[in-house]
Amino acid sequence: MSYVEQYYESISRLLRQTVDEGEEVLGKAADIMVHAIKEGKSLYLFGASHAGIIAEDAFYRAGGLALFNPIFSPALMLNVEPITLTSKLERLEGYGTILLESKPVKQGDVLFIHSVSGRNPVAIDMAIAAKQKGMTVISLTNVSYSKSVESRHSSGKRLFEVSDLVMDNHGEPGDAAVSVKSLSQKVAPTSTIVGSFIIHSIVLKMIEQLEEAGREVPVFRSANLDGGDAYNEAMMERHKHQIHYM
């Protein structure tokens, strides 16, 4: 089997496992978020470095939910030089709390945090601070990976241990999936593809609930379709009390 075929098999297995074993937790995540929306609360997304790709993928995207508010830090994005700065800052205790407090978060809001290892302070701090503010914390992590490493946070806790709801991407420790002949290190990470599938699956389950309740489904149209800009502007105006990125 070629390396590409091995990767395809790994991704296919993980997606199937997510549906077969994780559909209940997908539904629970959707329940939490829909309840918050109905109560006029806000939804936030966070991830550091490559984990932040999931927040980017779900935010301000054609076919995506308009109510996701990302928490981005320029110092944790992949255009930083030197790139190793992202690793140093996500290990800096207190930084996650500062980032959360830069947003208008309030009791009853929901925070979705993606961290593959779940061991670094930026995600753990943010989760702890969010819970102290009365927010609900949903985490997406690699549970087996996280259990195999020690926390870098002074509490000794990992992300899955400080979250209200834990979602598992079912990946391997180290994230990469394909063994190659010339390396001891595996190649081809799985967390981004699986994470993207998970966040969009949550949105689909949310839409099912919103439709059943007769509520508007605030989803973006492509700005490159005729009428897309006007549609999106009107929708964002209707939901401006839950949108904090404009």
Swiss-Prot record:
Family matches, as PROSITE patterns: SIS
Species of the source: Shouchella clausii (strain KSM-K16) (Alkalihalobacillus clausii)
CDD domains with a match to the protein in the record: SIS_RpiR (cd05013)
Any one Gene Ontology molecular-function term assigned to this protein's record: carbohydrate derivative binding
Transmembrane segments: none
HAMAP family on file: UPF0309
All copies of domain SIS, residue ranges: 33-212
Gene3D superfamilies assigned: Glucose-6-phosphate isomerase like protein, domain 1
GO biological process terms held by the UniProt record: carbohydrate derivative metabolic process
Alphabetical list of SUPFAM superfamilies matching this protein: SIS domain (SSF53697)
Record InterPro entries: RpiR-like_SIS, SIS_dom, SIS_dom_sf, SIS_GmhA/DiaA_subfam, UPF0309
Name listed for the protein in its UniProt record: UPF0309 protein ABC0887
Entry's family note: Belongs to the UPF0309 family.
Superkingdom: Bacteria
